[in-house]
Amino acid sequence: TDTDEFKAINDKYGHPVGDEVICALANRCNQKARKVDFLGRYGGDEFILLLPGTTLEDTIHVAERIRKEIGSTPIVTSAGAIPVTISLGVASVQCDEDTVISLLIRADKALYVAKQKGGNLVIAGKLTREGPIFEIHPSLV
C-alpha cells in the first residue's frame, strides 16, 4: 500500500502529523486483516500486508476492503480530520518459481500502475505466458 498524496500531507501539516496519519493507517489496516496476516511498514508511507493461504482473488477483495475503509472516513489528527486515500498493488504466488522478491517486485509494479492511473485503486499483478500484466480486477470495475 502507498498513501496517495502523502508528501502534500507532510508539507501542509508537518511530519509529526504525517506520522499520526501513518499510525492511523496501520491501525485501520490491522483492523481489516485476519489474525494470521502480517502488516509491516516497508518504508516511508508504504506498507506490506502478507495474507497467507489466500488466492489472488481473495487478496484483491481484502485489498479493496482496506482501500474503501481508509477512504471512507478522514483520519483524525492533532491538526484536524484529514481525508486520505491509498493505492494498493497486489500479487500472489502463481508458480513454483515465485519468490518473496518476485512477489514484491510484481506488487510494487502494480502499485506504480495504480498511482499512474490517479491513485485510490487496487491493481493486481498477474503472471501470464506473455509475462506479467497489471490490471484493475474485473470484479472491482
Question: Residue locations for each model-derived region?
Answer:
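Conserved catalytic/ATP-binding subdomain
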Residues: T54-E57, G80, D98
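Conserved metal-coordinating catalytic motifs of nucleotidyl cyclase and c-di-GMP turnover enzymes
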Residues: D2, G44, A107
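HATPase_c (GHKL) ATP-binding subdomain of two-component histidine kinases
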Residues: L49, V84-I86, A124
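Catalytic-core segments of nucleotide cyclases and related cyclic-nucleotide turnover enzymes
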Residues: I60-A63, V93-A124, E130-V141
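PAS-family sensory domains and close relatives that share small-molecule sensor folds
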Residues: G53, V90-Q94
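Catalytic core regions of nucleotide second-messenger enzymes
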Residues: R41, I70-I86, L103, K115
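Cytosolic catalytic cores of cyclic-nucleotide second-messenger enzymes
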Residues: E5-G53, E57, H61, R65, ...
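A structural signal for short, well-ordered beta-strand segments
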Residues: T1, F47, I86-V90
